[in-house]
From Swiss-Prot:
This is Peptide chain release factor 1. Methylated by PrmC. Methylation increases the termination efficiency of RF1. It is found in: Cytoplasm. The lineage of its organism: Bacteria, Bacillati, Bacillota, Bacilli, Bacillales. The modification N5-methylglutamine is found at Q233.
Length: 358
């Protein structure tokens, strides 16, 4: 571990030099790239340097204990030694976690797509509930949300809805939401009080940068049309909605807000995210043949969570976490779930680094 930390510290110093190089300062792409890399290493280097300082302090104290016979001084030195011996192992654990390879997409903005699945109108209402939950969670984290495309249900909620979440770390906070979400509750229209089970699927797509996904203009077919609301009525009287088709893959992205220019930009953003997601899924499938993740496969059809309204219970099936606080969670208080899933992922990666042992 310490050899790795020395390499990280050495790279950090190299980046300091690069960032003061005029050739780098005058190259916006290089400056952004090296600045981000340095920022990613900053905490690891800070903790490692603090660790080394405390390690030296402990050695100095041990040397002083061997040289002094003064009772008061010995007592004081022993207290300092004991405190450092307690602190250093905690710092070592922190350094292990800091060395875990970071998901390169963690800091990115995302596109979230929610689709009503089994359960008819109740599934659409639940899709709307999930949309509201994620919007509140995003707001609590200082992220900005914006609807890209929405197909409303006649009885409330959405048949499907996609929206962007913008802000540093959006993907790291929402990536575990990929999969099928199941709700168990009595629908408002149910007179007999029977509990119905419905599902909605969630896809979280990291937004792609131009360098990560290349799209040629000749591979695109762009159509404009009038958008429709619930029940099929026309929302706009002009052809402002945009549909972009990527001809080589057949991937389609649409946006149906009021401005055609904004719709084109939004649809293009979604198209890039979907193509990038296809690329990531292919890579993950190769990786999945070698290992199975504790926090799920990322498969959109995998049931990941159940929301049981009669018992006010939410269960995340990937890590066996059950919380009796459904109302708070549906109000966007997802921190406890996200933190538990993040810890599970970190533990798993740590095992891999240590060849299967913690």
């Amino acid at each position: 571990m310490f050899d790795q930390l020395d390499i990280v510290e050495e790279r950090y110093e190299q980046l300091n030099e690069l960032l003061s190089d005029p050739d780098v300062v005058n190259d916006a792409d290089k400056l952004r790239k090296y600045s981000k890399e340095q920022a990613d290493l900053q905490k690891t280097v800070d903790v490692y340097r603090s660790y080394k300082t405390k390690k030296e302090e402990l050695q100095d104290i041990e040397d002083m204990l061997n040289e002094t016979s003064d009772k008061e001084e010995v007592e004081m030195l022993k207290e300092e030694s004991s405190a450092l011996k307690t602190e250093l192992p905690d710092m070592e654990e922190e350094l292990k976690i800091l060395l875990i390879p970071k998901d390169p997409n963690d800091d990115k903005d995302v596109i979230v797509e929610i689709r009503a699945a089994a359960g008819g109108d109740e599934a659409a209402i639940f899709a709307g509930d999930l949309m509201r939950m994620y919007s509140k969670y995003a707001e609590a984290n200082g992220f900005k949300t914006e609807i890209v495309e929405a197909s409303e249900s006649d009885h409330g909620g959405y048949k499907e809805v996609s929206f962007s979440v913008s802000g540093t770390g959006a993907y790291s906070k929402l990536k575990f939401e990929n999969g099928a979400h199941r709700v168990q509750r009595v629908p408002e229209t149910e007179s007999g009080g029977r509990i119905h089970t419905s599902t909605a699927t969630v896809a979280v797509l990291p937004e792609a940068e131009d360098v990560e996904i290349e799209i040629r203009n000749e591979d695109l077919k762009i159509d404009t049309y009038r958008s429709s609301g619930a029940g099929g009525q026309h929302v706009n009287t002009t052809d402002s909605a945009v549909r972009i088709t990527h001809l080589p893959t057949g991937v389609i992205a649409t946006s149906s807000e009021k401005s055609q220019i904004q719709n084109r930009e939004k649809a293009m953003k979604v198209l890039k995210a979907r193509l990038y997601d296809m690329k990531l899924q292919e890579e993950q499938q190769k990786y999945a043949s070698q290992r199975k993740s504790a926090v799920g496969t990322g498969d959109r059809s995998e049931r990941i969570r159940t929301y049981n309204y009669p018992q006010s219970r939410v269960t995340d099936h990937r890590i066996g976490l059950t919380l009796q606080k459904l109302n708070q969670i549906m109000e966007g208080n997802l921190d406890e779930i996200v933190e538990a899933l993040t810890l599970s992922e970190q533990t798993e990666k740590l095992k891999e680094l240590n060849n299967g042992e913690l």
